């Protein structure tokens, strides 16, 4: 007799939900470990609980190395998608430029009607405003990504500074113990200030 199928839906009882989360998380991590061993692959698992607690596990390489490789590959895929999107955006502009060029290369360019020229001018202005709007949007996205990188670097800087402070404190404690007659009332050395 096999297991009965469990309907996949949200578990209403909070304690049952927590127990199920814990068991399934451990099962998922175990399966990832098995996949890594059997297939000799690098596997990283990141799970965030409903309460916001982070669980991660990696086998083979360090989890940060695996994520870095993923980001590099994903960035290449995003660049390819971005190029396809740009091509799709430029096709109407290309057609418009070809229309303008054909109008201007007509043998009787002086006989082109005013309405036709006004229409071409409006199309060019529309294309130009769309291009400028897209450029502004891309610049804002770039600025936001730089702000996010700055935030991450500041956080990393704080972590490193606090680690340096702990290491400096440990080193001075060790030095105090090495010298006879040193008092415990020595001044604690200052840590390096954070970069602003």
Curated annotation (Swiss-Prot):
Keyword Transcription regulation: yes
InterPro entries per the UniProt record, alphabetical: MADS-box/MEF2_TF, TF_Kbox, TF_MADSbox, TF_MADSbox_sf
Induction section of the entry: Slightly repressed by vernalization. Negatively regulated at the chromatin level by VIL1 through the photoperiod and vernalization pathways. Requires EARLY FLOWERING 7 (ELF7) and ELF8 to be expressed. Up-regulated by HUA2.
One of the Pfam families matching this protein, by short name: K-box
GO biological process, one term: flower development
Subcellular location: Nucleus
Keyword DNA-binding included in the entry's annotation: yes
Swiss-Prot/TrEMBL keywords: Developmental protein, DNA-binding, Flowering, Nucleus, Transcription, Transcription regulation
Family matches, as SUPFAM superfamilies: SRF-like (SSF55455)
Domain of life: Eukaryota
GO molecular function: DNA binding; DNA-binding transcription factor activity; protein dimerization activity
Record domain MADS-box: where: 1-61
Tissue: Expressed in most plant tissues, embryo, seedlings, roots, leaves, stems, inflorescence, pollen, siliques and flowers.
Disruption phenotype: Suppress the late-flowering phenotype of photoperiod-pathway mutants. Affects natural variation in flowering behavior in both long and short days.
Gene Ontology cellular component list: nucleus
Domain K-box: 80-170
Note, other: The early flowering of cv. Nd-1 (especially in short days) is due to a deletion of AGL27. This deletion is associated with the QTL 'FLOWERING 1' (FLW1).
Subunit structure: Interacts with AGL39, AGL97 and AGL74.
Protein name: Agamous-like MADS-box protein AGL27
Species per Swiss-Prot/TrEMBL record: Arabidopsis thaliana
Gene: AGL27
């Amino acid at each position: 007799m096999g297991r009965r199928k469990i309907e996949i839906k949200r578990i209403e009882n909070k304690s049952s939900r927590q127990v199920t989360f814990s068991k399934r998380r451990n099962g998922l991590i175990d399966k990832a470990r098995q996949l890594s061993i059997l297939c000799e692959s690098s596997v990283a698992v990141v799970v965030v609980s409903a309460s916001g607690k982070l669980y991660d596990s990696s086998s083979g390489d360090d989890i940060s190395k695996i994520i870095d490789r993923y980001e590099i590959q994903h960035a290449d895929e995003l660049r390819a998608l971005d190029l396809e999107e740009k091509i799709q955006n430029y096709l109407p502009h290309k057609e418009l430029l070809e229309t303008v060029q054909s109008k201007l290369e007509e043998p009787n360019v002086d006989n082109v009607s005013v309405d036709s020229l006004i229409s071409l001018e409006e199309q060019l202005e529309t294309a130009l405003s769309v291009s400028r709007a897209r450029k502004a949007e891309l610049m804002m996205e770039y600025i936001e990504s730089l702000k996010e990188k700055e935030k991450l670097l500041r956080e990393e800087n704080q972590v490193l500074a606090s680690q340096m402070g702990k290491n400096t404190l440990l080193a001075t404690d060790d030095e105090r113990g090495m010298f006879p007659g040193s008092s415990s009332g020595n001044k604690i050395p200052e840590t390096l200030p954070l970069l602003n």
